[in-house]
UniProtKB/Swiss-Prot annotation:
UniProt keywords, alphabetically: Coiled coil, Isopeptide bond, Ubl conjugation pathway
Keyword flag Chloroplast: no
Notes concerning its domains: The N-terminal unstructured half of Pup provides a signal required to initiate unfolding and degradation by the proteasome but is not needed for pupylation, while the C-terminal helical half of Pup interacts with ARC to target proteins to the proteasome.
Name this polypeptide is given: Prokaryotic ubiquitin-like protein Pup
Quaternary structure annotation from Swiss-Prot or TrEMBL: Strongly interacts with the proteasome-associated ATPase ARC through a hydrophobic interface; the interacting region of Pup lies in its C-terminal half. There is one Pup binding site per ARC hexamer ring.
Residues with PTM Deamidated glutamine: 64
Organism: Mycobacterium sp. (strain KMS)
Gene behind the chain: pup
Post-translational modification as stated in the protein's UniProt record: Is modified by deamidation of its C-terminal glutamine to glutamate by the deamidase Dop, a prerequisite to the subsequent pupylation process.
GO biological process terms on file: modification-dependent protein catabolic process; proteasomal protein catabolic process; protein pupylation
Residue ranges of the region described as Disordered: 1-37
Region described as ARC ATPase binding: spans on this chain: 21-58
Length: 64
């Protein structure tokens, strides 16, 4: 339990320098957004090619 609290408390040091951290945070958000868009595009491509197989596999695994 003490380790968990230590990890949470250690993460707050990044907020000390807002001028440098804001730019880095914005870059990270943009990179994550780009990676998410790429992943969603890949999922769309798979669904366009194999939508029927995807649905069949999903239902067999207990999806509704």
């Amino acid at each position: 339990m003490a380790q968990e609290q230590t990890k949470r408390g250690g993460g707050g040091g990044e907020d000390d320098d807002l001028s440098g951290g804001a730019g880095a945070g914005q870059e990270r958000r943009e990179k994550l957004a780009e990676e998410t868009d790429d992943l969603l595009d890949e999922i769309d491509d798979v669904l366009e090619e194999n939508a029927e197989d995807f649905v069949r596999a999903y239902v067999q695994k207990g999806g509704q």
